[in-house]
Amino acid sequence: MRILKIISLTASTIILLLVIVCAVIWTFNPLAPDVVVADPAPYGQRINDDGLIANFYPVDKPGVHPAILLLGGSEGGIGSTRMAQALQKQNYAVLALSYFGAPEQPKTLELIPLELFDQAIAWLASQPNIDGDKLAVLGTSKGAEAALIIATRHPELRAVAAGMPSSVAWQGYDPNLLKQIITPPDGSWSLKDKPIPFLPYTREYVDGPLEIYEKSLVEQSNYPEASIPIEVVGAPVLLVCGELDAIWPSCDMARQIKERATERQGPDVTVLAYEKAGHAGFGVPLETDHSRFSQLGSIGGTAEDNNFARIDSWTKTLEYLRASFEVHQEHVGN
């Protein structure tokens, strides 16, 4: 009988472990793709300057031009070539920054120094043919979280655009699942070698990435300092989100940001929420015969609905950038 009990307990333990492993595998992709550090040629150049790893896309026209710091998401490296070149064609100089994952950079999205973004903005402002009074930051997903945090520290920015944004600073992320489980990462971001306040992930059972963020946000009131202080941002803010986002509840968090800004007399916040779009609903639209078109429907919504959101939101993003820089020019002129 004792042997049967031992076998039963052992089997139960194994089943429990399998359930936990399956839940984690569903939440965090164990087969994370190789980090891409895209070749900037022929329209840009690689920057490797005192820890700054980026692709720079200058404007090939006379005069001085606005500049944009461009931030990708939790994929790491530099994979936003299409967006960078699309902005470059609109006469914006673009610095597509890698903040983790590239050679000689951290392999985990943990304790990324905010000073790195300070350095990137200073580098941009110092370049010839760039108007240092016309700077913006644009980020997607985890890069949107970073963009909003950066904006709270840089009142000189004239525009802040965030696709699939977060209203809080989150715990970090390690693509190595075993390490993620055994030694959970610290916060995503640091300042002066210390983590900034962050919202930790729930330790409850979850069924997919969306649920981990939804359950974690339930505890947000217990971590008030993790909320991004949008009220101190000095520029108008544009937020783009998909109601069917399967990664995190970007529209709920976008509305949180707008509500906080309104309650605390912060900047104007515009939310573009797309009912049928998912996490891929922001960015440069793709042609329907593009090799990656079908992937637009892999993280919420259909490929067609996500591309529709891209067509609409990208047009409005360009209008927003143009208007933000023009308003600043009018204020300077007065």
Regions found by a protein language model. Give the residues of each.
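Alpha/beta-hydrolase active-site loop
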Residues: 107-128, 149
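Hydrolase active-site cap/lid region
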Residues: 27, 31, 149-215
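Conserved alpha/beta-hydrolase
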Residues: 88-104
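N-terminal cap/lid segment of alpha/beta-hydrolase-fold proteins
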Residues: 22-66
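Alpha/beta-hydrolase fold nucleophile elbow
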Residues: 129-141
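Active-site glycine-rich loops that stabilize anionic/oxyanionic intermediates
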Residues: 65, 72-77, 243
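C-terminal catalytic histidine-bearing segment of alpha/beta-hydrolase fold enzymes
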Residues: 255, 264-334
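Short beta-strand/loop motif that positions the catalytic acidic residue
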Residues: 233, 239-241, 245
